[in-house]
Amino acid sequence: MDSRLYWIWLQQALPAGSHAVGELLDTFGHARAVYEATAEQLRKAEIGDDVCRMLSDKSLDTAYRILNRVLELGDWVLTPEDALYPLSLRHMTGCPAALYARGVMPDLDSIPSVAVVGTRSASREGWREAFALSAGLAAGGM
């Protein structure tokens, strides 16, 4: 089975930026091992009851749909086990379990980068400001 499915499953199971990703990887080593962990093994990892509940749904259906769509579009899924996954993210406690990209993949560790992060329920003004900031950064070569 394509190991990216387990990374996508993990990403979908936990909130963005969850510190549990790093803790789980420190304990289990790989997303597949997290997926295969029993409820008891997850509890012993001391990640909290909420995270254990989030990881109790072992369905890979959503992960399959996401991966198939990404591949249909000719896009990329990068996971911490991929050589192109940025080292700067790999060693973050709340590292993303999966990154999605389109086009030619540069060496992301060798170029300056900026992340624009915000709430999922941003105001209209917040969206405009984030768009303007991102457009300005892109126009400036970031």
Question: What do the predicted segments below correspond to?
Answer:
Residues M1-A135, A139:
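Short, positively charged patches
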Residues M142:
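A short helix-loop-beta submotif of the ANL/AMP-binding
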